[in-house]
């Protein structure tokens, strides 16, 4: 079953949001109590990359660039992920040669190209397995609100355009827990998007004493894009961001098709997309994350004129990742010495 985030989450509070407020109060109370629990501790530095809201914010590319930076510092990072949509049970180490998105989830498969990834609903058990494999740094992909593993540092990612939506807690809005609870337990915020669009994010950070950092997504295409016209399709948290990124590198998006996040395309879906593109003489464009799900069903063989887009990040502070990792390790050492 695929569920897309409702549009009213990302607008000013509506009548529907008002009607759902009683349910939000109950959910928010439970979420706050859950975040107050004492999590299990592992003898490794732990950096959590999370977000305030349900839906895509850009966590996966952040974890990837942090993995790359950690390796340049001589570390062996391991990534803990729940593995949304996985079918494998227990703790599982992702193997890019043998696993596919259907079995382990699309995001873990992307992450496994850059670091060892353990998926499990039990994040502590996954971290233990990574430690057994020789990892000396844990990067936790999501899990900030669940408190299933002690974290030395929590970096929360915000999409500059969407921000916190209407500012309400689920189901009246996109917040995973009351904002004041999340702000009190996180360490810093990374706003992803154009700098001008990040301005409104300053408002809810001001006065917290927490730092705010900036980055923007830089698209990487599998083929030349400039001057080509596209039918772009995606089943990710925020497909509009992907469509806009094609225009940023001089591609022309003529038509778009959006699907729910983590959606597994069918033969009929791709047949329809190919027909639309052929009629209009367009190239097809999709994300690397979507492509892992297409490959999982071996549907990529018959697709012609398809360009796959990956992303990296450009940080306002060039040394952001290295400084962050050094802070995480320093906090871990302080925690260890205080025992």
UniProtKB/Swiss-Prot annotation:
Its EC number is 2.7.1.130. GO terms for molecular function: ATP binding; tetraacyldisaccharide 4'-kinase activity. GO terms for cellular component: plasma membrane. The keyword Ribonucleoprotein does not apply. The keyword Repeat does not apply. It catalyses: a lipid A disaccharide + ATP = a lipid IVA + ADP + H(+). It is an enzyme of class 2 (transferase). Belongs to the LpxK family. NCBIfam families: lpxK. This is Tetraacyldisaccharide 4'-kinase. It comes from Bartonella bacilliformis (strain ATCC 35685 / KC583 / Herrer 020/F12,63).
């Amino acid at each position: 079953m695929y569920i897309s985030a409702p549009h009213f989450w990302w607008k000013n509070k509506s009548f529907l949001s008002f009607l759902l407020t009683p349910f939000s109060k109950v959910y928010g109370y439970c979420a706050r109590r859950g975040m107050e629990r004492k999590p299990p501790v592992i003898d490794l530095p732990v950096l959590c990359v999370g977000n305030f809201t349900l839906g895509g914010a850009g966590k996966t590319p952040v974890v990837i660039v942090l993995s790359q930076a950690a390796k340049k510092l001589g570390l062996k990072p391991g990534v803990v992920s729940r593995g949304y949509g996985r079918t494998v049970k227990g703790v599982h180490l992702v193997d890019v040669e043998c696993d596919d998105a259907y079995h382990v989830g699309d995001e873990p498969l992307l992450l496994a190209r850059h670091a060892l990834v353990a998926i499990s609903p039990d994040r502590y058990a996954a971290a233990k397995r990574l430690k057994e494999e020789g990892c000396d740094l844990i990067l936790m992909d999501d899990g900030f609100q669940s408190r299933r593993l002690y974290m030395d540092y929590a970096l929360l990612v915000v999409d500059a355009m969407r921000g916190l939506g209407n500012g309400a807690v689920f189901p009246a809005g996109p917040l995973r827990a009351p904002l004041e609870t999340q702000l009190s337990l996180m360490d810093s915020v990374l706003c992803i998007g154009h700098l001008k669009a990040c301005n409104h994010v300053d408002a809810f950070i001001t006065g917290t004493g927490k730092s705010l950092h900036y980055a923007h997504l830089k698209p990487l295409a599998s083929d030349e894009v400039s001057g080509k016209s596209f039918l772009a399709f995606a089943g990710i948290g925020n497909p509009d961001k992907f469509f806009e990124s094609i225009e940023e590198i001089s591609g022309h998006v003529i038509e778009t098709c959006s699907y729910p996040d983590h959606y597994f395309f069918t033969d009929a879906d791709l047949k329809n997309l190919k027909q639309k593109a052929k009629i209009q003489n367009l190239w097809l464009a999709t994300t690397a994350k979507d492509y892992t799900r297409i490959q999982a069903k071996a549907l990529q063989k018959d697709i012609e004129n398809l360009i796959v887009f990956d992303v990296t990040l450009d940080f306002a502070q060039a040394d952001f990742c290295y400084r962050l990792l050094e802070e995480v390790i320093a906090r871990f050492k302080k925690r260890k010495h205080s025992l």
